């Protein structure tokens, strides 16, 4: 089992109103930042539905000098759209990304579109080089779509092989599965 202290981060969904955004930036973020998280992350919404509000929240938090990672899920976006967003993040000094497959709206996906998280990681790494620290999702209790433990491990390894720097998990209830997961990753 790893003896390294776990990193804690806080995940935001972009507020729908200006009042909610103001509260998130002026009250919530400073209060949570006092707990010394490794970073904050901001979700992207299914199919990039919150793309603009994600960018605004991420930029404001970054301008306050706080480490923030936008979620980047392709959700059917083509490589040009994802590449343009990566260029914008780089120009704004964003160095950490959370690369996810994300929830795909029905009817999305196709030959010119990224389909799996490892493809997105490889695309980010190819386009941005070492500029970005790429976080990916990991599932100590096994991804709901995984056929087996082994297939889930293979997917995780594929993301790391594609260029991911580290993996994050969501809150979970089975602490034993988390420690088993850490042992598996260390092996």
Regions inferred by a protein language model and the residue ranges of each:
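Alpha-helix-loop-beta-strand connector modules within alpha/beta enzyme cores
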Residues: 34, 48-71, 114-136, 179-187
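Active-site-adjacent structural elements that line small-molecule/cofactor binding pockets in enzymes
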Residues: 82, 129-187
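Glycine-rich, proline-tolerant flexible connector loops at the mouths of alpha/beta enzymes
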Residues: 37-56, 102-112, 166-185
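Conserved, mostly hydrophobic/aromatic
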Residues: 11, 40, 89, 159, ...
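Glycine-rich anion/phosphate-binding loops
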Residues: 74-91, 111-116
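Active-site mouth loops of central-metabolism enzymes
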Residues: 7-24, 46, 68-80, 133-151
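Structural preference for beta-strand elements that scaffold enzyme active sites
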Residues: 5-9, 38-41, 67-71, 96-98, ...
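Short, acidic/polar
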Residues: 18-32, 54, 79-87, 147-158
């Amino acid at each position: 089992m790893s003896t390294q202290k776990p990193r804690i981060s806080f995940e935001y969904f972009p507020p729908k109103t200006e009042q909610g955004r103001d509260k998130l930036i002026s009250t919530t973020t400073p209060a949570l930042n006092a707990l010394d998280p490794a970073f904050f992350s901001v979700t992207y919404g299914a199919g990039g539905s919150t793309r603009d509000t994600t960018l605004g929240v991420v930029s404001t938090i970054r301008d306050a000098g706080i480490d923030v990672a936008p979620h980047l899920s392709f959700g059917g976006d083509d490589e040009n759209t994802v590449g343009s967003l990566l260029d914008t993040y780089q120009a704004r000094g964003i160095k950490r990304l959370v690369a996810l497959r994300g929830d795909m709206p029905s009817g999305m996906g196709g030959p010119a579109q990224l389909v799996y998280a490892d493809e997105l990681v490889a695309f980010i790494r190819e386009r941005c080089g070492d500029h970005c620290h790429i976080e990916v999702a990991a599932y100590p209790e096994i991804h709901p779509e995984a056929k087996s433990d082994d297939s889930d491990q293979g997917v995780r390894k594929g993301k790391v092989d594609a260029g991911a720097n580290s993996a994050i998990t969501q809150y979970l209830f089975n602490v034993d599965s988390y420690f088993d997961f850490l042992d598996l990753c260390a092996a």
